[in-house]
């Protein structure tokens, strides 16, 4: 049975974040190909040599460019340097292209640094959606749920977060809704992969539930 507290809070959160959304999704279409998007930074939690770059992709939801990770590392990430959100949402379109060990696409929020943040991801090899927190470089599982994630297909991954409440949606369907308090306070937002996942991202979108200061 659904928790009535969580169901009610998710309705309130949806109303709040719609009012504080970033005006337009970030489609990487004005960024230089072969380089990171302007205002973004990349790295890895753990070890490895991730390769993040803007590339052309004829299948992109908002053509012509995508942000693509084609290297390998424990947990590669790429985050915006100019945004800091405590409560709100983060959303992205992603396509899992290949990977022998993993085929993951995810989003991060309340990102303090490369060792401390929340992450939600969908996995085309495992056909599931998972929620984690990372503290001091160690990733810990909060919950995972089976979900259809066919590879080489564009999906929409969205996370709504307000205080302790977290809701994870894939392609418009809610798969995880719970409370957790491991990572608190404002932080950056971005995208994430795992291991040898080759993943493309497009239409990155975020919003804050806090009203802008006048």
Model-inferred region functions:
Residues 23-44, 213-214:
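Extracellular carbohydrate-recognition regions
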Residues 184-214:
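Ligand-recognition surfaces built from glycine- and aromatic
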């Amino acid at each position: 049975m659904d928790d009535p507290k969580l169901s009610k809070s998710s309705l309130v959160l949806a109303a709040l974040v719609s009012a504080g959304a970033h005006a337009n999704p970030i489609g990487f279409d004005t960024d230089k190909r072969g380089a990171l998007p302007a205002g973004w930074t990349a790295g890895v939690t753990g070890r490895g040599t991730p390769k993040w770059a803007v590339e052309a992709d004829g299948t992109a939801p908002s053509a012509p460019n995508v942000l693509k990770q084609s290297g390998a590392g424990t947990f590669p990430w790429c985050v915006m340097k100019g945004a800091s959100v405590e409560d709100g949402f983060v959303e992205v379109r992603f396509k899992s292209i290949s990977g022998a060990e993993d085929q993951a696409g995810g989003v991060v929020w309340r990102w303090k640094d490369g060792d401390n943040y929340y992450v939600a991801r969908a996995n085309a090899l495992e056909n599931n959606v998972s929620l984690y927190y990372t503290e001091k470089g160690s990733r810990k599982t909060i919950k995972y749920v089976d979900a259809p994630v066919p590879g080489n297909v564009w999906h929409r991954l969205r996370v709504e977060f307000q205080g302790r409440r977290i809701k994870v949606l894939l392609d418009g369907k809610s798969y995880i809704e719970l409370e957790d308090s491991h990572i608190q306070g404002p932080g950056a937002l971005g995208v994430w992969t795992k291991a040898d996942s080759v993943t493309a991202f497009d239409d990155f979108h975020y919003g804050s539930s806090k009203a802008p200061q006048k």
